[in-house]
């Protein structure tokens, strides 16, 4: 089937454009000041239709960045090569955040940024998944999350119908898989991350969208 409708949903909506622009700005320092002796290396988890990927790749074009586009399903991988292969050094792979990366063929401690857009909350145990994701990040690197932090009732008849929506098994969540910004901070601290910040600010008008960009550092 066609991915065009889903791609439009995750890129054209005003809220998506705003939050993806924040995520794109967050990766700028890695592009402007790449690691010595090699191009930047980025791993995206749960890439799906590539809504956030598109914004990041626009920022990365011409930088020589090695970009790993991964998803728990292989259904999106061929389309990713069509859309993004000419702009970055693209690698694609099936990846499940509930399993250790190295056993799935991902090199440990080697990515300058690991990013996930509304994907990491799908993990069964967030503290465990956060710790495993941390193991993929090089010292000094970052985790960049885009996450919905507010649950709305209409989710129950949309995303709530997706298989796996309720399969979480940790103490951080009771009824829905989404976490507040403060709960994300707790999960990431347990996972070994430091210097955790989020945007937009809690008291801003933009925060009413219920979406956050969360940055966390590995030292």
Predicted segments with their positions:
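4′-phosphopantetheine-dependent carrier domains
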Residues: 1-219
């Amino acid at each position: 089937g066609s991915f065009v409708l889903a791609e439009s949903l995750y890129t054209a909506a005003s809220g998506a454009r705003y939050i993806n622009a924040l995520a794109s700005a967050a990766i700028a320092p890695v592009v402007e000041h790449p690691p010595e002796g090699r191009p930047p290396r980025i791993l995206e988890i749960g890439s799906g239709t590539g809504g956030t990927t598109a914004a990041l790749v626009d920022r990365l074009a011409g930088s020589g960045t090695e970009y790993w586009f991964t998803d728990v399903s292989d259904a999106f991988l061929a389309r990713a090569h069509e859309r993004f292969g000419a702009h970055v050094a693209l690698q694609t792979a099936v990846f499940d955040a509930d399993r250790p990366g190295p056993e799935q063929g991902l090199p440990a401690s080697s990515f300058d940024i690991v990013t996930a857009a509304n994907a990491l909350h799908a993990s069964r145990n967030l503290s465990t998944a956060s710790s495993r994701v941390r193991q993929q990040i090089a010292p000094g690197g970052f985790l960049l999350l885009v996450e919905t932090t507010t649950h709305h009732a209409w989710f129950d008849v949309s995303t709530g119908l997706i298989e796996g929506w309720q399969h979480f098994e940790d103490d951080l969540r009771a009824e829905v898989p989404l976490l507040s910004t403060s709960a994300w901070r707790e999960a990431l601290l347990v996972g070994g991350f430091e210097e955790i910040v989020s945007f937009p600010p809690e008291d801003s008008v933009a925060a009413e969208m219920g979406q956050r960009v969360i940055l966390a550092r590995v030292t």
